[in-house]
């Protein structure tokens, strides 16, 4: 789950990272009052959960309360990358001498928690890495031992930090990692980290948490806004279905996250575009679970075919087949299915589906391998 900028800043401030003074407004009149309270010179920032707000016109400066009102009037109601702006953050303008970058992420290559920092801030870290790779500094550390002070000092010395900037950067890196571990975050980021005459401030803030850890952090779960979630993902979450909407036209259902991702990869290799990730989870003893998964995938109007890839150990293929039949009986529309059943009672499951297809006219294609299934699904999707 990604938090809004103003929510992330509240958490950062709670942990001792300085942030600009500001408040959230949902109307131009509110924005005007907040700007007056802050002295007139403010920045009005769209609060939506996508990047690129500035380039899309969602971040603008104002030099008076009246101008803040006019700017807010333009930003509120805007649609940026499919997200409608319902609120803005109005905060004091900063006199920035420099802009730095600092963030925490779990690096997928090293599989280690990693601090990334740079003297070049205000742009995407990927852009910095592409144009100025030497400007990016990384600290990999052992999650069992945590981030050691000497590791941070060594990295900052190598990057050329000294004096007061060294002290403040050290402090912010340590606090950013503390926040990440306290909230089980996948990402904590300050970009830009503003260097002002008064010290370092988080001019922008990001905090992405792990959805699977939210039950341990009810205070974060309460911040989730239904309007900012993909409707299909929200419905799946409420039903307990492990689903991610991807926007392609080949629906994917597999029993296991690894199998689902491998299926998606091969669909991509075959020139197709997966519509979703869906992991049914283990067991599938209850046919209703399979039924609900298939019906949910079919709610995406872009889906033209569904590839069902099942490897059955504890799972029994006849229960999977029963769930597919239940779904097809209820489905509001018909799409072709590509089905690969392997494992416990696969012959029984296949016979059930073949009989149903023959009697009801359902278009079900059976395959023997994941490659054959992906190829067939891409072909049917057109």
From Swiss-Prot:
Keyword field contains ATP-binding: yes
Family assignment from sequence similarity: Belongs to the succinate/malate CoA ligase beta subunit family.
Enzyme class of the recorded protein, top EC level: ligase
GO BP term (any one): succinyl-CoA metabolic process
Alphabetic keyword roster: ATP-binding, Ligase, Magnesium, Metal-binding, Nucleotide-binding, Tricarboxylic acid cycle
Functional description taken from the UniProt entry: Succinyl-CoA synthetase functions in the citric acid cycle (TCA), coupling the hydrolysis of succinyl-CoA to the synthesis of either ATP or GTP and thus represents the only step of substrate-level phosphorylation in the TCA. The beta subunit provides nucleotide specificity of the enzyme and binds the substrate succinate, while the binding sites for coenzyme A and phosphate are found in the alpha subunit.
An example Gene Ontology CC term for this record: succinate-CoA ligase complex
Protein name: Succinate--CoA ligase [ADP-forming] subunit beta 1
Record lineage: Archaea, Methanobacteriati, Methanobacteriota, Archaeoglobi, Archaeoglobales
An annotated Gene Ontology molecular function: magnesium ion binding
Needed cofactors: Mg(2+)
Pathway: Carbohydrate metabolism; tricarboxylic acid cycle; succinate from succinyl-CoA (ligase route): step 1/1
SUPFAM superfamilies: Glutathione synthetase ATP-binding domain-like, Succinyl-CoA synthetase domains
Reaction(s) this enzyme catalyzes, per UniProt: succinate + ATP + CoA = succinyl-CoA + ADP + phosphate; GTP + succinate + CoA = succinyl-CoA + GDP + phosphate
HAMAP family hit by this protein: Succ_CoA_beta
ATP-binding is among the record's keywords: yes
UniProt domain ATP-grasp: residue ranges: 9-235
Subunit structure: Heterotetramer of two alpha and two beta subunits.
EC number: 6.2.1.5
Protein residues bound to substrate: 255
Domain of life: Archaea
Co-factor remark: Binds 1 Mg(2+) ion per subunit.
Cross-referenced Gene3D superfamilies: ATP-grasp fold, A domain, ATP-grasp fold, B domain, Succinyl-CoA synthetase domains
Source organism (scientific name): Archaeoglobus fulgidus (strain ATCC 49558 / DSM 4304 / JCM 9628 / NBRC 100126 / VC-16)
Pfam families: ATP-grasp_2, Ligase_CoA
Binding site for Mg(2+): 191, 204
């Amino acid at each position: 789950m990604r938090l809004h900028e103003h929510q992330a800043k509240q958490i950062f401030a709670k942990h001792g990272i300085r942030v600009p003074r500001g408040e959230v407004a949902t109307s131009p009149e509110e924005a005007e009052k907040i700007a007056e309270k802050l002295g007139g010179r403010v920045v009005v920032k769209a609060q939506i959960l996508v990047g690129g707000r500035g380039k899309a016109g969602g971040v603008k400066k104002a030099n008076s309360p009246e101008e803040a009102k006019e700017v807010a009037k333009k930003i509120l109601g805007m649609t940026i990358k499919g997200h409608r702006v319902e609120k803005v953050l109005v905060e004091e303008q900063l006199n920035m001498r420099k802009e730095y970058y600092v963030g925490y992420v779990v690096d997928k290559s090293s599989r280690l928690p990693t601090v990334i920092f740079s003297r070049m801030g205000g742009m995407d870290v990927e852009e910095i890495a592409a144009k100025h790779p030497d400007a990016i500094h990384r600290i990999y550390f052992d999650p069992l031992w945590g981030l050691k002070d000497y590791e941070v000092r060594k990295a900052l010395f190598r990057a050329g930090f000294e004096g007061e900037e060294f002290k403040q950067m050290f402090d912010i890196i340590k606090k950013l990692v503390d926040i990440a571990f306290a909230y089980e975050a996948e990402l904590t980021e300050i970009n830009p980290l503003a260097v002002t005459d008064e010290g370092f401030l988080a001019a922008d803030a990001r905090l992405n948490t792990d959805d699977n850890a939210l039950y341990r952090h009810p205070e974060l779960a309460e911040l989730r806004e239904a309007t900012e979630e993909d409707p299909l993902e929200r419905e799946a979450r409420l039903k307990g279905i492990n689903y991610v909407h991807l926007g392609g036209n080949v629906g994917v259902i597999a029993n296991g996250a690894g199998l689902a991702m491998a299926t998606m990869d091969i669909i991509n290799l075959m020139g197709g575009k997966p519509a979703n990730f869906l992991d049914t989870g283990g067991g599938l003893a209850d046919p209703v679970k399979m039924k609900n998964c298939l019906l949910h995938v079919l709610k995406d109007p872009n889906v033209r075919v569904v590839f069902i890839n099942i490897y059955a150990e504890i799972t029994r293929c006849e229960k999977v087949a029963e769930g597919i039949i239940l779904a097809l009986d209820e489905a509001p529309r018909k799409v072709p299915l590509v089905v690969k059943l392997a494992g416990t009672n696969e012959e029984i499951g296949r016979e059930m589906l073949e009989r149903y297809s023959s009697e009801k006219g359902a278009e079900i294609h059976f395959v023997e391998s994941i490659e054959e299934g992906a190829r067939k699904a891409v072909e049917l999707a057109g």
